Curated annotation (Swiss-Prot):
Pfam families listed in its UniProt record: BRCT, DNA_ligase_aden, DNA_ligase_OB, DNA_ligase_ZBD, HHH_2, HHH_5, Nlig-Ia
Protein name: DNA ligase
Recorded GO MF terms: DNA binding; DNA ligase (NAD+) activity; metal ion binding
Family: Belongs to the NAD-dependent DNA ligase family. LigA subfamily.
UniProt: Zn(2+) binding residues: C459, C462, C477, C482
SMART domains xref list: BRCT, HhH1, LIGANc
UniProt entry tagged with the keyword Amino-acid biosynthesis: no
Any one Gene Ontology BP term: DNA repair
Length: 774
């Protein structure tokens, strides 16, 4: 074992603190302070140091989030305080009945109120003790003359919080360090899943406070964002595994995985909502209301849902509920209702619990998002990649405010699992509250003569045999001349994020394919005025505009062209990454998968798809024809001599990061001297001089980015905005024109709403960028 020096010990501690702060800023505050690549490099360095010097490993190190060995089983543990579920209310009248009950209970108690309203719960010092824990408030003085029947109960504050659709967790901290994470279980006994809990980046391994309390317990909800959930299901579907029914089931199943490495890959998130302290910590943290409790949780380093609101009346509660019933579809996670609590923790304590529920809280559920209907038939769709998707044709039904007539059945495996028959009664829901899908079949209601639906063996569009590739759940048509694949490819090529051909919509694409004028994307650039005007409802003016739009599309940058080619798994971000590494189509088309996967962010599977696509003769012919037509197939070379020197300097910096402390200092001194000499210390964005924006929607506008975007990193979005003439700032102010909102928008979004700043999704931003030509 290498000798541990004070210098190495101090350096390791500093490295650990930097990573902890960067993780907190990214996962909890949603305000990144460190580039992903830098974080990954520093984490790897910390792992190497801890491997070399095991005595430096501490329980709250970022390296300890994922365990090395899978667990063999989970141990049952008793909760320090029972983890009760909530009573449900399904409409406002039931909420009012709950209010009447707690008010009546309060009057019946006729006890003296303890003021000030203090929230303290006694917890015994050892989490292994099995005694019952009781809520007490022995430290606050009793004020005479202040009993329940003298209080204006109608003026008591409520606090409303979104009910996150996930799995409840109880987290125990001793001396500020996370020592246990447990599931709800039956409310009295749960399972110790500490190893899995540590993989959730929004759960602090160490409380962010000096001199922490001896014992702290935090309750909250572990959940999967909609985007992460959909990605997990897509991966499971691809390898032939059964997909999860909903994010809640996926979160629960993930938490009970014996291998924490699997848990880490699924990117669970966590919102904290309750804090319990030991009685003798009275001088440490003072809080008297649930709203103060939430603020304190944030100070301790926890992520708290930003949409909570204190309401002074049931009318305000109703308004809050109605607002989020309409707005929840815009959230990046699922919420199935609103949790309404009495804000006063002392009043909560006085009211106590029934055998099942707290008397001081209730879950006001949204209208049902699942509803039964009848399958009248099944049709099969063919996507642009040849994927065959069965779709249930339903008896029209109202669901989440819209009429649903069709629902996805995903693939043949899912269809077989459901054992679907025409005429079956099925339960339908909005997947991610957006796309309708069939959740389950009710076979007990099946008509006697109902026929099981059989997946076709031949493509419904071109009649060619269908195949199901190994290790995939999706059945495909592989006929490159299939009309459905061609229609999808043309629509994708013309989309705003690709070549942005204005006027080439779905109906016109259908006409071009049906008429035989277009049999390949390349045929678009051979269309004449005579060809177009021969189509129904296509006059000379419209035809001329379309020809102009197609001419303009030839100048779109190489990254857009690559995206437009429709290679599987090559979205806008991957296209950007690939074209930076391979600035010409010749370089990319000749690259092997092993070369392609060296691009940061491109895995071996995507690399294989890219290599295979360019090996298909029909695709090679398409690329050649597009080049002949004048479509851009390379990135303009913006690499000056100084920029090339910059690459050398960056290589030196990377080398420095791998050296010992003394050698690193020498190399860093060299880098500093090069800076003074005027050498640029950052890579020039290869897209910056592709288009000089003279005017447009974004020019001169101020943007703020918040949350995790679906397909882009925030630095990529920032570069695109700046290239279009916009300005990106880190904080929201009255001068902010737009806020681009990703998953878990946080406090920036909240402030933007108050200031009336216009919100943009990633797709809306890309549309605006497409208009500018970026």
């Amino acid at each position: 074992m290498a000798k541990l020096t004070l210098e190495v010990e101090q350096y390791t501690q500093n490295l650990r603190e930097k990573l902890q702060e960067a993780g907190y800023s990214y996962y909890v505050l949603d305000q990144p302070i460190m580039e992903d690549a830098v974080y990954d490099h520093l984490l790897r360095e910390l792992q190497e140091l801890e491997s070399q010097y095991p005595q430096l490993i501490v329980s709250d190190s970022p390296t300890q989030r994922v365990g090395e060995k899978p667990a063999t089983k989970f141990v049952s543990v008793k909760h320090n305080i029972p983890l009760y579920s909530l009573e449900n209310a399904f409409n406002i009248q039931e909420l009012k009945s709950w209010q009447e009950r707690w008010q009546r209970q309060t009057l019946l108690e006729n006890q003296r109120l303890t003021l000030p309203l203090r929230g303290e719960v006694k917890i015994k010092n050892s989490i292994d003790e099995s005694d019952n824990f009781s809520t007490v408030n022995s430290l606050a003085p009793v004020i005479t003359g202040s009993n329940f029947d003298e209080i204006d109960l109608a003026s008591v504050d409520y606090i409303c919080e979104l009910k996150i659709d996930g799995s409840a967790l109880a987290l125990t901290y001793e001396n500020g360090l996370l020592v246990r994470g447990a599931t709800r279980g039956d409310g009295i006994m749960g399972e110790d899943i500490t190893q899995n809990v540590k993989t959730i980046n929004s759960i602090p391994l160490k409380l962010k406070v000096d001199n922490p309390p001896l014992l702290v317990e935090v309750r909250g909800e572990a959940f999967l964002s909609i985007n992460v959930f959909e990605n997990i299901n897509a991966e499971r579907e691809k390898i032939g595994e059964i997909i999860f029914a909903n994010p809640r089931n996926a979160a629960a199943g993930t938490l009970r995985q014996l291998d924490s490495k699997i848990v880490a890959k699924r990117r669970l998130d966590f919102f904290a909502y309750t804090l319990y302290l030991e009685e003798n910590e009275s001088n440490f943290l003072q809080f008297y209301t649930q709203s103060q409790c939430l603020e304190l949780l944030k100070k301790l380093g926890f992520k708290v849902n930003p949409n909570g609101q204190v309401c002074s009346s049931l009318n305000e509660v109703e308004a809050y509920y109605q607002y989020w019933d309409k707005q929840r579809e815009n959230l990046p996670y699922l919420t199935d209702g609103v949790v309404v609590k009495l804000n006063s923790l002392s009043l909560q304590e006085k009211l106590g619990f029934t055998q099942k529920y707290p008397r001081w809280a209730i879950a006001l559920k949204y209208p049902a998002e699942e509803i039964p209907t009848i399958v009248q038939g099944v049709t099969v769709q063919v996507g642009r990649t040849g994927a065959i998707t069965p779709v249930a044709e339903l008896k029209p039904v109202q669901l989440a405010g819209t009429t649903v007539q069709r629902a996805s059945l995903h693939n043949s495996d899912r269809l077989a699992e459901l054992d679907l028959h025409i005429g079956d009664t099925v339960i339908v829901r909005k997947a991610g509250e957006i796309i309708p899908e069939v959740v389950r079949v009710l076979p007990e209601l099946r008509p006697k003569k109902a026929q099981r639906f059989q997946m076709p063996t031949h493509c419904p569009e071109c009649s060619q045999p269908l195949i199901k590739p190994r290790n995939e759940a999706v059945t495909r048509c592989i006929n490159t001349s299939c009309p459905a694949i061609l229609r999808g490819s043309l629509a994708h090529w013309a989309s705003r994020a690709a070549l942005d051909i204005n006027g080439l919509g779905e109906k016109l694409v259908q006409q071009l394919v049906n008429s035989g004028l277009v049999k390949s994307v390349a045929d678009l650039y051979n269309l004449t005025m005579e060809d177009l005007t021969s189509l129904e409802r296509m006059g000379k003016k419209s035809a001329n505009k379309l020809i102009e739009a197609m001419g303009t599309s030839k100048a779109q940058p190489w990254r857009r062209v690559l995206y437009g080619l429709g290679i599987r798994h090559v979205g806008t971000v991957n296209a950007e990454l690939l074209t930076q590494k391979f600035p010409t189509v010749a370089q990319l088309s000749q690259a092997k998968a092993t070369d392609i996967e060296t691009v940061h962010g491109i895995g071996p599977e995507i690399a294989q798809y890219v290599e295979q696509w360019f090996r298909v003769p029909a695709n090679q012919n398409l690329v050649e024809r597009l080049k002949i037509a004048g479509v851009t197939m390379e990135t303009k070379d913006s690499t000056s001599g100084m920029a090339k020197l910059t690459e050398t300097v960056l290589a030196i910096q990377n080398l420095a990061a791998r050296q010992n402390l003394v050698a690193r200092q020498n190399l860093e001194n060299l880098v500093e001297r090069l800076k003074i000499a005027g050498v640029t210390m950052e890579t020039k964005d290869s897209t910056s001089d592709v288009v000089e924006v003279q005017s447009g929607l974004l020019r001169g506008k101020t943007f703020v980015l918040t949350g995790t975007l679906p397909t882009m990193r925030r630095d990529e979005a920032k570069n695109l905005i700046q290239n279009a003439g916009g300005k990106v700032t880190s904080s929201v102010s009255s001068k902010t024109d737009f806020i681009v909102v990703g998953e878990d928008g946080g406090s920036k979004l909240e402030k933007a709403k108050k200031l009336g700043v216009k919100e943009l999704s990633e797709s809306e931003l890309l549309e605006a960028l497409a208009v500018t030509g970026i």
